[in-house]
Amino acid sequence: MMMGVELAFPKVVGKQVYGSLYECDEDVLKDTKRLEQIIKEAADIGNMNILDIKSWKIGEGVSVVAIILESHITIHTWPEYRFATVDVYSCGPHTSPLNAFRYIVEKLGAKRYTINEADRSSEF
């Protein structure tokens, strides 16, 4: 296992940006159609290609999963706490999961958030 090593020429590219969003706009967190639209726009901003989007209303919250050609984007919401989790993962060297993540943060109206980045690339 190589920890903390950046690969110069990975054969498999994997970039993941994920985090927790706090003090979000409660109305947006409840709105399935709006969340789907936000994911579509985020994918465009991150230069990703959406294959399919599925959503589920769970109580007041919503889970939205977008399968992108390059991997996935997810948003899970808890409006009663004004809280959401977001995960943007891409295997495309031409993509920007960070730009997509930042767009989602902005559109959910998060007053504060955590952000984590993982390089999941491999040289094989």
Swiss-Prot record:
Listed Pfam families: AdoMet_dc
GO MF, one annotated term: adenosylmethionine decarboxylase activity
Gene Ontology annotations for the cellular component aspect, listed alphabetically: cytosol
EC category name: lyase
Activity control, per UniProt: Competitively inhibited by methylglyoxal bis-guanylhydrazone. Irreversibly inhibited by NaBH(4) in vitro.
Maturation and modification: Is synthesized initially as an inactive proenzyme. Formation of the active enzyme involves a self-maturation process in which the active site pyruvoyl group is generated from an internal serine residue via an autocatalytic post-translational modification. Two non-identical subunits are generated from the proenzyme in this reaction, and the pyruvate is formed at the N-terminus of the alpha chain, which is derived from the carboxyl end of the proenzyme.
E.C. code: 4.1.1.50
Pathway membership, UniProt: Amine and polyamine biosynthesis; S-adenosylmethioninamine biosynthesis; S-adenosylmethioninamine from S-adenosyl-L-methionine: step 1/1
Catalytic activity: S-adenosyl-L-methionine + H(+) = S-adenosyl 3-(methylsulfanyl)propylamine + CO2
Entry keyword annotation includes Transmembrane helix: no
Family, as annotated: Belongs to the prokaryotic AdoMetDC family. Type 1 subfamily.
Protein known as: S-adenosylmethionine decarboxylase proenzyme
Native source organism of the sequence: Saccharolobus solfataricus (strain ATCC 35092 / DSM 1617 / JCM 11322 / P2) (Sulfolobus solfataricus)
